[in-house]
From Swiss-Prot:
Chain's role: Cytokine that plays important roles in allergic inflammation and immune response to parasite infection. Synergizes with IL2 in regulating interferon-gamma synthesis. Stimulates B-cell proliferation, and activation of eosinophils, basophils, and mast cells. Plays an important role in controlling IL33 activity by modulating the production of transmembrane and soluble forms of interleukin-1 receptor-like 1/IL1RL1.
Gene: IL13
Organism: Bos taurus
Subunit structure: Interacts with IL13RA2.
GO cellular component term of the entry, any: external side of plasma membrane
The protein's name: Interleukin-13
Length: 132
């Protein structure tokens, strides 16, 4: 019985190591959603002086893709906390000098619209995903 219990515990512990990508915790995703709501609501002036970022397909690696797109915006203090949250949710760390070829870059949109799209998609993920 003790051997069976030990085997179950080992399988549970190693199960997370074999998953294809880390699953964000519900708390981290909820904090990101709250931050995006705070940023996007009641915008009377252009966010980040109307800076433009690459529009992305947020269906795969959405946190890394969003971080990769926002990392080039350096003079906007409003999104610094969002970038830190995305950095924590992203398993690999992109840099401003390293442009990822993983994402198709064909259209630029304003940061405000990008964050609204990210908020909408994050809410969908939060509603539909099961968290540990």
């Amino acid at each position: 019985m003790a051997l069976l219990l030990t085997a179950v515990i080992v399988l549970i512990c190693f199960g997370g190591l074999t998953s294809p990508s880390p699953v964000p915790s519900a708390t981290a995703l909820k904090e990101l959603i709250e931050e995006l709501v705070n940023i996007t609501q009641n915008q009377k002036v252009p966010l980040c002086n109307g800076s433009m970022v690459w529009s992305l397909n947020l269906t795969s690696s959405m946190y890394c893709a969003a971080l990769d797109s926002l990392i080039s915006i350096s003079n906007c203090s409003v999104i610094q906390r969002t970038k830190r949250m995305l950095n924590a949710l992203c398993p690999h760390k992109p840099s401003a000098k390293q442009v990822s070829s993983e994402y198709v870059r064909d259209t630029k949109i304003e940061v405000a619209q990008f964050l609204k799209d990210l908020l909408r998609h994050s809410r969908i993920v939060f509603r539909n995903e099961r968290f540990n």
